């Protein structure tokens, strides 16, 4: 079985392709077959990826050079077991397109906090790693509203007139915004930190299911 992850941002040229690249690389050696894809609710199909965010942190251009922007579709959302949106507007676009996705659609930063919390508590045991991952996603959804999310932060706009803008704690901001963008360095730092957390949690769940080392009695039963 495969576990499918869809990453989403507005144009599918900067944030979601970078999240896709990092997750794909981190999960490449997993015994479970992860399929990671990306799309954008306002994407211009075929557009090349922005490599600035990757260059800031030493990711080679080759990892993004083959990327071409893809418009978010109902089929892509329906196929995904987990949707990771860059920010709340992109997450809202996913749910508008496919309302039944609300329980498996999160922002990246929201998902990282919920997943880390879920994996640190008593969780279900499953023989099949994909079942364990699906149960994790369900648990993450159940935890909404019960776990403290990151607070909003203020970041400097990297052009005149110099000022600071507030970024919601659930969002990875868009460095390509026409008004009040933040720097690519801020964006890449947030993506790397939270994608790393997600990859670590997903790998832990797979490993626990594969070798039977997961917590004992399940408090959530899949399906």
Please identify what each model-predicted range represents:
Residues 87-88, 109:
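Short secondary-structure boundary segments
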């Amino acid at each position: 079985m495969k576990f499918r992850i869809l990453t989403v941002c507005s144009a599918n040229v900067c944030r979601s392709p970078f999240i896709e690249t990092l997750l794909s690389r981190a999960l490449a050696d997993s015994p479970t077959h992860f399929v990671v894809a990306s799309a954008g609710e306002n994407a211009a199909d075929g557009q090349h990826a922005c490599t600035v965010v990757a260059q800031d942190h030493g990711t080679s251009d080759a990892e993004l050079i083959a990327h071409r922007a893809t418009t978010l579709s109902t089929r892509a959302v329906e196929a995904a077991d987990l949707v990771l949106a860059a920010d709340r507007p992109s997450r809202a676009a996913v749910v508008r397109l496919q309302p039944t996705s609300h329980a498996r659609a999160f922002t990246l930063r929201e998902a990282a906090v919920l997943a880390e919390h879920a994996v640190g508590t008593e969780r279900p045991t499953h023989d099949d790693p994909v079942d364990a991952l699906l149960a994790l996603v369900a648990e993450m959804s159940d935890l909404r509203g019960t776990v403290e999310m990151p607070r909003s932060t203020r970041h400097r706009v990297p052009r005149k007139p110099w000022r600071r803008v507030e970024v919601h704690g659930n969002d990875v901001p868009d460095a390509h915004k026409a008004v009040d963008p933040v720097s690519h360095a801020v964006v890449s730092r947030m993506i790397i930190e939270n994608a790393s957390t997600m990859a670590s949690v997903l790998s832990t769940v797979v490993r626990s299911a594969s070798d039977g080392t997961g917590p004992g009695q399940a408090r959530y039963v899949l399906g």
